Every structure is written in C-alpha cells, then in structure tokens.
Amino acid sequence: MELLVERTFAIFIAISGPILTIFDLPGNTLLLLTSLMFAFFDEVLYFNGRLLSAMVLIYALGEFWEFCVGLFGIKRRKVSWFAVIFIALGSFTVTLLGTLIFPILGSLLGGMAGAFAAAFAYELAHAGVSAAAMQLAWTAAKMRFFAMVGKLAAGIALAALLLKQVVFFKYII
C-alpha cells in the first residue's frame, strides 16, 4: 500500500511539474525537490546517484537556458539593462494575465505578447522609430518563446526521470 501511495504521488508531481513550468511557476524545482525527498526518504529503494546527478544537471541547464536566452538574447540587440528588466517584467505580468484568461496556452502566448508589448513600448519611447520598435518586439517575443521551450523540455526530462526513480525502479531485494 505504501508503494502505491508513493507511486501515485510521484505520478501526480510528474504531471504537475511541467504544467507549472508552463505557467512560469517553479515546476522544475518541485520535480527536483520531490526526487531528492524520495531519495532521502527511502534511500534503499530510491537513491540512485547517477539519476540524481542527472536531474540536478538537467535542472541547472534548464534554469541557465531560460536566464541566458531570455535576458542575453534581448541584450545582444544593444539595449540597456533597464530595457531588459522592463521586458522581463512585462513578459511576466502578461503571462499571469494570459493564464487567467486562457489557461495553459494563454500563459505561453501571454509571455510572448508581454515581451512583445514591453519591448515595443520601450523602443518606441526611447527611439521613436516604429520599425526599430517592431524589430525589437519580435526579437523579444522569439527569445521568450525559446526560453520557455527550453525550460519546458528540462521539466519534461525531470518528470521522466522522477518516474524512472519512483515508478519504474528495480527492486534491490
């Protein structure tokens, strides 16, 4: 009975983690912490050094990918750090609004639309040229999309490894 509860909990977290990641919530962190919790809860059954190392590496790469693509992808367009932060805040704010209006897909589209709108508004106010503003806005939307896809891929990999660790493990007995 205990194994059934543990497996059910792991399956629930493995499904919830990537969904939370889509909403810009800490789904990948939840997946990693759940895996570590299982490993230290019953180390005979669930502790696997290679698997946990792979999960930590995938988690770090997913966070690094989102940070670098989201921020430095826009920064290479030679905008100020204020613009980068303004675009990130616009993206996050409209992600939340998009999630409220149209769950799941709305968060992804909201993040891209928020980055687009914030970049367009910044560049239009800064330079006053709508063509340059449109170009920066499209770049911001694309960078936000690529950042989210990379982090979601890491979340799906973490979910698969959590299922491998808890549901599809080999009995050592």
Predicted region positions:
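C-terminal ends of transmembrane helices
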Residues: 13-22, 64-75, 123-128
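Alpha-helical transmembrane segments of multi-pass membrane proteins, especially transporters
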Residues: 31, 51-59, 79, 83-91, ...
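Interfacial loop-to-transmembrane junctions
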Residues: 129-153
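Helix-adjacent hinge/juxtasegments
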Residues: 61-99
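Interfacial segments of multi-pass membrane proteins
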Residues: 30-47, 94-98, 102, 113-122
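Small-residue-enriched transmembrane helix starts and helix-helix packing motifs
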Residues: 1-20, 83-93
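Juxtamembrane boundary at the C-terminal end of a transmembrane helix
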Residues: 160-173
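Transmembrane alpha-helix interface/packing and boundary motifs in multi-pass membrane proteins
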Residues: 13-31, 93-104
